Amino acid sequence: MNIPAELKFSKSHEWVRLEGDEAVIGITEFAQEQLGDLTFIELPAAGDTLTAGEEMGSVESVKAASELYAPVSGEVTEVNLHLEDAPEAVNESPYDKGWMLKVKVSAVAGSLLSAEEYAALIESEAH
């Protein structure tokens, strides 16, 4: 399973790529594998404010529905609109074409995990 070392991860399986005061957010490869083929993604709009740890949207798949939780606080600056018509991009490329949001960060959740810590988390959840 691909767990990019340069990313941070939440316990609810969102990833964050911090780029200065901006963050790119998506869901992990593990999350999309557990959900199966995504059929619908609900995301906040540009200009909306996120609070770390609070709900920021949801995803639906052929198997399940799941809430998405903000790994950072801040203002949404961009939403990947391509996902409205092609939610399967998250299944095909969760860390690249399947990114969900860009956020101007005001605070980062203190509980974000390194790639190594996240690998241990999913290993424990698998058993």
Swiss-Prot record:
Query: What is the scientific name of the source organism?
Result: Oleidesulfovibrio alaskensis (strain ATCC BAA-1058 / DSM 17464 / G20)
Q: Mind listing the GO biological process terms from this record?
A: glycine decarboxylation via glycine cleavage system
Cellular component, GO, one term:
glycine cleavage complex
Q: What is this protein called?
A: Glycine cleavage system H protein
Q: How does it assemble?
A: The glycine cleavage system is composed of four proteins: P, T, L and H.
The UniProt entry's sequence similarity note says: Belongs to the GcvH family.
Gene3D superfamilies recorded: 2.40.50.100
Q: Where is the Lipoyl-binding domain?
A: 22-104
Q: Which InterPro entries match?
A: 2-oxoA_DH_lipoyl-BS, Biotin_lipoyl, GCV_H, GCV_H/Fam206, GCV_H_sub, Single_hybrid_motif
Q: What is the lineage of its organism?
A: Bacteria, Pseudomonadati, Thermodesulfobacteriota, Desulfovibrionia, Desulfovibrionales
Keyword annotations from UniProtKB, A to Z:
Lipoyl
Which PANTHER family does this UniProt record tie to the protein?
A: GLYCINE CLEAVAGE SYSTEM H PROTEIN, GLYCINE CLEAVAGE SYSTEM H PROTEIN-RELATED
